[in-house]
UniProtKB/Swiss-Prot annotation:
A Pfam family per the record: Fib_alpha
Domain notes for this protein: A long coiled coil structure formed by 3 polypeptide chains connects the central nodule to the C-terminal domains (distal nodules). The long C-terminal ends of the alpha chains fold back, contributing a fourth strand to the coiled coil structure.
Residues with PTM Sulfotyrosine: 6
Transmembrane segments: none
Sequence ranges of Acidic residues compositional bias: 1-10
Organism: Bos taurus
Name of the protein in question: Fibrinogen beta chain
Sequence ranges of Basic and acidic residues compositional bias: 24-34
Region called Disordered, residue ranges: 1-54
Record's keyword annotation contains Secreted: yes
Subcellular location: Secreted
Amino acid sequence: QFPTDYDEGQDDRPKVGLGARGHRPYDKKKEEAPSLRPVPPPISGGGYRARPATATVGQKKVERKPPDADGCLHADPDLGVLCPTGCKLQDTLVRQERPIRKSIEDLRNTVDSVSRTSSSTFQYITLLKNMWKGRQNQVQDNENVVNEYSSHLEKHQLYIDETVKNNIPTKLRVLRSILENLRSKIQKLESDVSTQMEYCRTPCTVTCNIPVVSGKECEKIIRNEGETSEMYLIQPEDSSKPYRVYCDMKTEKGGWTVIQNRQDGSVDFGRKWDPYKQGFGNIATNAEGKKYCGVPGEYWLGNDRISQLTNMGPTKLLIEMEDWKGDKVTALYEGFTVQNEANKYQLSVSKYKGTAGNALIEGASQLVGENRTMTIHNSMFFSTYDRDNDGWKTTDPRKQCSKEDGGGWWYNRCHAANPNGRYYWGGAYTWDMAKHGTDDGVVWMNWQGSWYSMKKMSMKIRPYFPEQ
């Protein structure tokens, strides 16, 4: 960048008075000090002679004798000597030679100085021209850069305008819709929680009317003309006390005693040995507008009772399940027995039929070899997180199927089916949602895999009898 002495189109600036240097200020750092030019010598040589004096009237004219000038005298005495002699001329030239030589030398010096000054001036002018060209190139480059930045700014401005006018409102509408959806779900969950809190405010009791008809199990009740699916009292043995169960009188000709039911996650199945032994949960609730308990709740009938019922004679087990799309499958085992507590409620199942996959006998169909064998449930002991009877043989007490998979069950190492696992809304879940990072949902691997928790699952038993 160089300072300029030109206005460069700044005609619109306010006019100010010029200083002593006008518009060319002297910059001591960038300019040489100005030098004075030599003074030229005075002009020498002859001039006019003095004018003759004019005689006044009456004045006597005096004859003037011209001096001897070593030359020829003019005929007219007033004109004096015509020309000097050679010697006189030589003397005159000699007298005038020195000042003339000095004047010539001075002139030569003056010419040299003027030449040097002209060369410096030319160089300065050339420098100014180059500076001017450089300034013009800079101005052009700056204009190009400004134009380029202006183009970029215009594009960014258009993008911002487009984003602000279109994208952001669209995203805001989407977010608003999501928030409304979440608000609706939260309100529903709050309502469900309030309902469950009302259920759990006091120990679970049944306030429904219980039918008079009874029997040792639900098959006997249907044979005694108890045809409605609801809660009944059964008494397997005369020596035992009657207890409540839910009887399914519609599925596969009815007569099914429900020993387990999952449908809404309202009951925690992560319990100790004694609750699983005795049973827990809500057997049934009253149907809307009806005075009987026609809606099954979530419950586990109890290992002692299940063992008692299955040891009364050959027993079938029907497992029904439903996913979150409403699709349903079943697993029917025509042989089902649970041993007593002394034998750790050991499981025995046989003769599978159905559409869900034979998870209890064959293990997880996705696995092969030893890995599949470790998921077979048949012949396993019952385990809870405080009574470890599973098939996972490890010295690490933390490695326990019931603790990691959320419920009590006939675990191997660990499961292909997990009906008593943790309840996950929506079906699909991931390891980071699980308490221990395991597939701890209400799982039937042979149908929906490890990471899908069923919406509904129930286990029902009925005495075996020949079909007509």
